[in-house]
Each structure stands twice: as C-alpha cells, then as structure tokens.
Amino acid sequence: MQTCCQALLLLLAACTLPAHCLEPTCLHFSELLPARLRELRVKFEEIKDYFQSRDDELNIQLLSSELLDEFKGTFGCQSVSEMLRFYTDEVLPRAMQTSTSHQQSMGDLGNMLLGLKATMRRCHRFFTCEKRSKAIKQIKETFEKMDENGIYKAMGEFDIFINYIEEYLLMRRRK
C-alpha cells in the first residue's frame, strides 16, 4: 500500500514539472537534429510533387544561395528564425487553402517547424538572434508579388529550406 502511494506521489510530482524539464536538454539538440530534419523531409515528400508541379515560375528562385550565406553568417539565427516564422505564419496557412487533400501533411510540417522554433527559443544561449535579414526581405517581397504562384514556389522549395536549416545547425554544432 505504501509503495502504491509513493508511486502515485512520484507520478503527480512528474506531472507538475514544467514541460521544458521533461524535454531533452539543449545540449542534446545537435544529437536529435538529424532525426528532426529527416522527419521534415519525409513529411515534405508527401506533398512535394503537388506543389512543384504547380510552380510555373521556373525562372524565379525564392531561396537563393544568398539566404544560405546569411544562415551561415554572424546573424544566422535571426535569418533562420525569420524564415521559420515566414513558413509558419505566411506560406503554410496560404498553402493549406490550395489543397484539401494535403492539409494534414502541411499541418504536420507546420507543427514540426513550430517545435524547431520553440527549441531554438528555449536554447537561445546557443543561438544569438539580433539582426533583420536583407535576403528574407527580398524573399517576402518576391513571394507577395507572385500572388498564388508564390505559394507553389515557396512550398516547392521547402526542401531547400530544410537543407539550409541543416547547414546552419550543423555549423552551430561544430562551434
């Protein structure tokens, strides 16, 4: 009987701990990163053909090497954060309006990006964020000018975005 009560008290105590205490620490983030990026890639594969086949603006590239350079630069964290916000707040909500059959996959992608953004915020001492990005300003302006085609372009290039995130986080991991 006493062991049962102790087990119940331990369970209750664990349930009242803040959520961040139950999550992996920031020190293990770099070890968990490959799996998180793989999950993003697998989920994107479910919708990739839909968006890339509707991208008629093949002479325009939203996610250029200039963005990757910013990700790798001094203020890479800010660029990554802005791009995560761009996809979660602008691209994915509008993309969900284009296809009812892909909403689950897009919702899952959004949740994965939000989780990555939350981890970066929680582990802020590893990621210094402080400056606005010129490349992202250009991306957003081009995206808006393209209207609905911008959705297909941004979602069609989502794999490039994942690769850039990976480059940034692997670079941070080496430091």
Curated annotation (Swiss-Prot):
| Transmembrane stretches, start-end | none
Entry similarity comment: Belongs to the IL-10 family.
* Keywords tagged on the record: Cytokine, Disulfide bond, Secreted, Signal
Recount the UniProt induction comment for this entry: By lipopolysaccharide (LPS) in white blood cells, liver and spleen 3 hours after treatment. Decreases to basal levels 8 hours after treatment. By primary infection with E.acervulina and E.tenella.
Please describe the organ and tissue distribution of this protein's expression. Answer: Expressed predominantly in bursa of Fabricius and cecal tonsils with low levels in thymus, liver and lung.
Q: Per the UniProt entry, what species is this protein from, by scientific name?
A: Gallus gallus (Chicken)
Protein's cellular compartments:
Secreted
Q: Which GO terms describe its cellular component?
A: extracellular region; extracellular space
Q: Which residues form the signal peptide?
A: 1-21
Q: List the disulfide bonds.
A: C26-C123, C77-C129
**Annotated GO MF terms:** cytokine activity; protein dimerization activity
InterPro entries, per the entry:
4_helix_cytokine-like_core (IPR009079), IL-10 (IPR000098), IL-10/19/20/24/26 (IPR020443)
Outline the subunit composition.
Homodimer. Interacts with IL10RA and IL10RB.
Q: What does this protein do?
A: Major immune regulatory cytokine that acts on many cells of the immune system where it has profound anti-inflammatory functions, limiting excessive tissue disruption caused by inflammation. Mechanistically, IL10 binds to its heterotetrameric receptor comprising IL10RA and IL10RB leading to JAK1 and STAT2-mediated phosphorylation of STAT3. In turn, STAT3 translocates to the nucleus where it drives expression of anti-inflammatory mediators.
Name of the molecule in the record: Interleukin-10
Query: Main localization of the protein?
Result: secreted
A biological process (GO) annotation for this entry? positive regulation of plasma cell differentiation
| Entry coiled-coil feature ranges | none
Query: Which additional comment does the entry carry?
Result: Chickens susceptible to E.maxima infection show higher constitutive and post-infection levels in spleen and higher post-infection levels in small intestine than infection-resistant animals.
